[in-house]
């Protein structure tokens, strides 16, 4: 099993990072390609384990899939309609195959998925949405099965809870439904907008993505097309926090400040000098004092839960401590005990963590528990005294494209080592 060995330093992280395409847009877009009857090309797709798994799943369904810079998918040859357990057991995103399969082929089944262990992420909202579009759903032998005679039917759907995943499932399925679907209380994340833009490129008629009401006029078929995946706002935020906690200056290229306004506002509140351009963001913490900030996670455009772990670290290193409240997922403070092994001070009370401030961290052996928590541990290792070993880094490989190379380019001393190393 691979690990990261990080030798900490008081030297600030300085330089430029090219941000990859967003995993949380690339995954639903690749699954949405099932809806097309002609080849599609998806550019700016990150090199991640979940992307590789999705490409393999599309191949297993019968699609022709290749990668040469962009990912090319020809879904015209799909002749299987089941996403099997051996492929989806590590990835919750696999549920996104269900809507496109039943919408285009009248049937689909997906093994109940796996992924990060960060609380309840039920597929109920996906199932309810598909049922409201006319699908018959059954649960058998660990599989969710969806069927419909003819086409799905447009409907007025009011979501019980704001859900990014279910919003995408319903939007994709409704694209080929008969009639118009109105989706109220929809999630507003940029990755939903990007998925809608992709579908519209193929001939879908979707409006309102990015607001809490999305309207989908169903069409009979979708053709081919080319799409460029939106920048990864969470990877962007992660490197900006790395600059802040190390007292450095980092410029993120190939990104968009409009995607993470809540994060940039908190970085400025923390004392960072934030500058932005059309496709870049910089954070400069040189000779500036890091100040604690209070964070409350919320659906977009609020503060993203996927940046909570990174700001937990920031608050631990800032003057005054800080309070972070997690409202999206339960059980998402598993990074806190690991950071405390490195000398951080914190107290967890329910869905809130109260951070104490410390002058420095010490290297330790720590364990990654989920995707974003692992990023905070790696950054902590970069600024700690001594050697930090981060175990179970397969979590980080699910969401960060070559993070060790990008950190090394900023001056970090980090390497990937095998168990024997």
Curated annotation (Swiss-Prot):
Instruction: Respond yes or no to whether keyword Cell division is given for this record.
Output: yes
- SUPFAM superfamilies in UniProt: EPT/RTPC-like
Highest taxon of the lineage: Bacteria
Entries under Pfam families matching the protein:
EPSP_synthase
Principal location: cytoplasm
The reaction(s) annotated as catalysed by this protein in its Swiss-Prot or TrEMBL entry are: phosphoenolpyruvate + UDP-N-acetyl-alpha-D-glucosamine = UDP-N-acetyl-3-O-(1-carboxyvinyl)-alpha-D-glucosamine + phosphate
Q: Which UniProt keywords apply?
A: Cell cycle, Cell division, Cell shape, Cell wall biogenesis/degradation, Cytoplasm, Peptidoglycan synthesis, Pyruvate, Transferase
What does the record give as its pathway? Cell wall biogenesis; peptidoglycan biosynthesis
Q: Which InterPro entries match?
A: Enolpyruvate_Tfrase_dom, Enolpyruvate_Tfrase_sf, MurA_subfamily, RNA3'P_cycl/enolpyr_Trfase_a/b, UDP_GlcNAc_COvinyl_MurA
- Spell out the subcellular localization from the entry: Cytoplasm
Residues that bind UDP-N-acetyl-alpha-D-glucosamine:
92, 121-125, 161-164, 306, 328
Where do the annotations place phosphoenolpyruvate binding? Answer: 23-24
Residues modified to 2-(S-cysteinyl)pyruvic acid O-phosphothioketal = 116
The UniProt record lists the EC number as: 2.5.1.7
Entry GO terms, CC:
cytoplasm
Q: Where is the active site?
A: 116
Q: Name one GO molecular function term.
A: UDP-N-acetylglucosamine 1-carboxyvinyltransferase activity
Gene Ontology biological-process annotations: cell division; cell wall organization; peptidoglycan biosynthetic process; regulation of cell shape; UDP-N-acetylgalactosamine biosynthetic process
Q: Which HAMAP family match?
A: MurA (MF_00111)
Write down the NCBIfam families for this protein, in alphabetical order: murA, PRK09369.1
Q: What does this protein do?
A: Cell wall formation. Adds enolpyruvyl to UDP-N-acetylglucosamine.
Q: Which family does it belong to?
A: Belongs to the EPSP synthase family. MurA subfamily.
Q: What is this protein called?
A: UDP-N-acetylglucosamine 1-carboxyvinyltransferase
| Species the sequence originates in | Vibrio campbellii (strain ATCC BAA-1116)
């Amino acid at each position: 099993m691979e690990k990261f060995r990080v030798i900490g330093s008081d030297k600030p992280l300085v330089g430029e990072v090219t941000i990859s395409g967003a995993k949380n847009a690339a995954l639903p877009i690749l699954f949405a390609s099932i809806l097309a009857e002609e080849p599609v090309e998806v550019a700016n797709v990150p090199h991640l384990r979940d992307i590789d798994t999705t490409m393999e799943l599309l191949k297993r369904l019968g699609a022709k899939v290749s990668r040469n810079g962009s990912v090319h998918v020809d879904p015209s040859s799909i002749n299987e309609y089941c996403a099997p357990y051996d492929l989806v057991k590590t990835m919750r995103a696999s549920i996104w195959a269900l809507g496109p399969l039943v919408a285009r082929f009248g049937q689909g089944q997906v093994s109940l998925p796996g992924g990060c262990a960060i609380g309840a992420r039920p597929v109920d909202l996906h199932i309810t949405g598909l049922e409201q579009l006319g699908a018959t759903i059954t649960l058998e032998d660990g599989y969710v099965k969806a069927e419909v005679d003819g086409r799905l039917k447009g409907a007025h759907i009011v979501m019980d809870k704001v859900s990014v995943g279910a919003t995408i499932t319903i939007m994709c399925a409704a694209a080929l439904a008969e009639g118009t679907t109105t989706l109220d209380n929809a999630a507003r994340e940029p990755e939903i907008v990007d998925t809608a833009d992709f579908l519209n490129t193929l001939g879908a008629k979707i409006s309102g993505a990015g607001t809490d009401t999305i309207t989908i006029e169903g069409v009979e078929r979708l053709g081919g097309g080319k799409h460029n995946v939106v920048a990864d706002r969470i990877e962007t935020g992660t490197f900006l926090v790395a600059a802040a906690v190390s007292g450095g200056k980092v410029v993120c290229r190939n990104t968009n400040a409009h995607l993470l306004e809540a994060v940039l506002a908190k970085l400025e509140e923390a004392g960072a000098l934030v500058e932005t351009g059309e496709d870049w963001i910089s954070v400069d913490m040189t000779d500036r004092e890091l100040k604690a900030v209070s964070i409350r996670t919320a659906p977009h455009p609020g503060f993203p839960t996927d940046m909570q772990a990174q700001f937990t670290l920031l608050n631990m290193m800032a003057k005054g401590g800080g309070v972070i409240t997690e409202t999206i997922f339960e059980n998402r403070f598993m990074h806190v005990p690991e950071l405390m092994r490195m000398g951080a001070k914190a107290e967890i009370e329910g869905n809130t963590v109260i951070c104490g401030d410390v002058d420095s961290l010490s290297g330790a052996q720590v364990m990654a528990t989920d995707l974003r928590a692992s990023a905070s541990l790696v950054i902590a290792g970069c600024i700690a005294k001594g050697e930090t070993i981060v175990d179970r880094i397969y979590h980080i490989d699910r969401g960060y494209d070559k993070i060790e190379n990008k950190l090394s380019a900023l001056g970090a001393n980090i390497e990937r080592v095998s168990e024997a190393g």
